Regions:
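C-terminal active-site rim and adjoining tail of enzyme catalytic domains
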Residues: 96-98, 161-245
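Short helix-capping segments at alpha-helix termini
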Residues: 130-135, 153-158, 201-202, 243-245
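Active-site beta-loop-alpha junctions enriched in small/polar residues
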Residues: 25, 54-58, 66-67, 107-109, ...
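Structural preference for beta-strand elements that scaffold enzyme active sites
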Residues: 19-21, 48, 101-105, 137-140, ...
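An active-site metal/cofactor-coordinating segment within enzyme catalytic domains
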Residues: 16-21, 47, 53-100, 106-109, ...
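N-terminal amphipathic alpha-helix/helix-capping segment at the start of soluble metabolic enzymes
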Residues: 4-22, 149
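Conserved, mostly hydrophobic/aromatic
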Residues: 23, 41, 52, 83, ...
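N-terminal active-site wall of soluble small-molecule enzyme domains
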Residues: 62-63, 112-128, 142-154, 170-171, ...
Length: 245
């Protein structure tokens, strides 16, 4: 029997060394989740960018971490024209990241004030992926399995990743396998060499978040993780290049 992630492994197994994934862009050097942050991520040597996706009242997918703006207004209750100019649409972000890989995290928890029970955001994201980057340069992640299941139903060619920050990593691996995932995205404190080995034995890539300590980056590289998601892609690039030298 084939390992659970084997059919799409090659889309995310990008190099022998871990891939540098810029968390919300180069967010230590520019405002997170903005076009300047994505430009800097490229300049700093990141191969991939991670960003957050939410849906506005008029159905536009935009890039923003929180469900609410700083003034308390909920994105899902506003049209795209009512948003601050620094918030890009997902289409604009994907255009900016042309030639890079993009990890789109769909924010859609039941506790969120903009919770999308119909998972319409998944349908919209699938269309944008095909229009701008294609599945080979994309992976879509979420803490919400149902959101990822909906995206898989719409377009099974797009690689998916299960995000988790708590709980038993073995259960997370099992869930990822049961739901047609390509990768797991564990919170760094949960990551051990045995977790990485077990996930990869199942054909799953392991992309770890959020790692800013150079020494920890070296440890994770030794574990053989596939990607390191970091706020400081320039630091990660230097560390990994030194290890490969």
């Amino acid at each position: 029997m084939a390992a659970c992630g084997a059919k799409r492994w090659k889309t995310v197994a990008m190099a022998s060394a871990p891939t540098v994934i810029a968390h919300r862009g180069a967010r230590e050097a520019a405002q997170e989740n903005t076009l300047p942050a994505f430009r800097l991520a490229r300049e700093f040597g990141a191969e991939w960018v991670e960003l957050d996706a939410r849906r506005t009242a008029d159905g536009v997918v935009v890039v923003h971490h929180d469900a609410q703006l700083a003034d308390g207004r909920v994105l899902a209750e506003l049209t795209v024209d009512e948003l601050p100019e620094f918030i890009p649409s997902l289409a604009e972000a994907l255009e900016e990241c042309h030639g890079m890989g993009v990890n789109i995290e769909i924010k859609n928890l039941p506790s969120d004030p903009d919770y999308d029970a119909d998972h319409l955001v998944s349908e919209a994201v699938a269309g944008l992926v095909q229009a701008y980057l294609g599945p080979e340069r994309t992976i879509v992640s979420s803490f919400n399995i149902d959101t990822l299941d909906r995206l898989y139903a719409v377009d099974p060619t797009i690689p998916l990743a299960y995000l988790f920050a708590i709980g038993d990593p073995a259960m997370a691996i099992a869930r990822a396998c049961a739901h047609e995932m390509t990768a797991i995205h564990p919170y760094d404190p949960l990551v051990t060499a045995s977790l990485v080995e077990r996930a990869q034995d199942e054909g799953l890539a392991v992309n770890v978040w959020t790692v800013n300590d150079p020494e920890r980056m070296k440890v994770l590289a030794g574990f053989g993780v596939d990607g390191i998601c970091t706020d400081v892609p320039d630091v990660a690039r230097d560390v990994l290049d030194t290890l490969e030298a």
